[in-house]
């Protein structure tokens, strides 16, 4: 019994990242002392008590983070310093549906190039984001167009995603007050519900957004509310898997809550979250030339 307790103690001493604050470390030692006083208990009872000590620390890292830190990690999860990904987009409507393939490059939160590769009629259509600015390119027009703010709410590629959805990246971190309003445990994960309320002078269209984030920073859902607090659309993760060395949502669906039969799915096919992306990729030349 003493050997088991010693191993338990050594485990925490060798893994200080599990106990991030002095308060939590103190609580741990209080629990160890209690276990010591109960060392004459049967092995089965001891194992149960040890699990109670260890269990809460599986998610201590996420628990110690603020709503802003949780959301920042969630946004960074599918970007990294720079990334390359291949995706499939499926648009569903009551009387038609369409599937497209896409390639995308990103660098940080401020730069992204997204290009359609199929079907043939859409191939080459692309969007470039640099900071607050966004340009589109259509091969048929043979020129790029900078999108004015009045067009940012329009549909991107006929989907349920808007240009604003593509461009906003860290907008939630800059223009919203964030707070964790609920926590729950589901399938071994702690789930955090975060409310995002825009600042009074924020240049945003939504009255509120609510995100549900898992303790490993996977964004499970994001619901958009209008100014009267009516939910308008929702982005939900349909499947989580490991891709590119990370556990991410590999299949997401954006649904129009006012039209349940209308939705758009985005599925990751390939991803490299440590891609070496050249500076020239995020230029108007690359946008229009395809190189």
PLM segments and residue spans:
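C-terminal segment of classical bacterial N-terminal signal peptides
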Residues: 51-59
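Gly/Pro-enriched, hydrophobic low-complexity segments
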Residues: 146, 167-169, 189-283
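Extended lipid/amphipathic-ligand handling interfaces
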Residues: 74, 102-106, 236-242
């Amino acid at each position: 019994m003493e050997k088991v307790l010693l191993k338990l103690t050594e485990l925490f001493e060798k893994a200080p990242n599990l106990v991030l604050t002095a308060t939590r470390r103190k609580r741990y030692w209080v629990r160890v002392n209690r276990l010591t006083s109960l060392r004459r208990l049967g092995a089965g009872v001891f194992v149960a008590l040890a699990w109670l000590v260890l269990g809460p620390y599986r998610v201590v890292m996420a628990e110690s983070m603020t709503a802003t830190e949780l959301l920042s990690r969630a946004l960074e999860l599918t970007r990294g310093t720079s990334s390359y990904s291949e995706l499939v987009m499926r648009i569903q409507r009551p009387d038609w549906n369409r599937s497209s393939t896409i390639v995308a490059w990103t660098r940080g939160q401020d730069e992204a190039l997204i290009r359609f590769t199929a079907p043939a009629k859409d191939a080459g259509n692309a969007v470039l984001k640099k900071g607050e600015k966004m340009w589109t390119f259509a091969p048929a027009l043979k020129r790029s167009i900078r999108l004015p703010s009045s067009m940012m709410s329009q549909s991107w590629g006929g989907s349920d995603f808007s240009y604003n959805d593509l461009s906003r990246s860290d907008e939630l971190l800059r223009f919203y007050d964030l707070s964790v309003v609920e926590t729950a445990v589901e399938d071994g994960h702690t789930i955090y519900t975060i409310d995002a309320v825009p600042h009074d002078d924020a240049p945003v269209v939504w009255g509120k957004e609510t995100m549900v984030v898992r303790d490993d920073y996977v964004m499970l859902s994001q619901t958009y509310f209008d100014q009267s607090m009516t939910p308008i659309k929702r982005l939900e993760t349909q499947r989580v898997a490991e891709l590119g060395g990370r556990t991410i949502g590999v299949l997401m669906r954006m649904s129009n809550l006012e039209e349940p039969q209308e939705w758009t799915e985005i599925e990751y096919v390939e991803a490299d979250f440590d891609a070496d992306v050249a500076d020239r990729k995020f230029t108007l030349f690359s946008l229009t030339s395809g190189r």
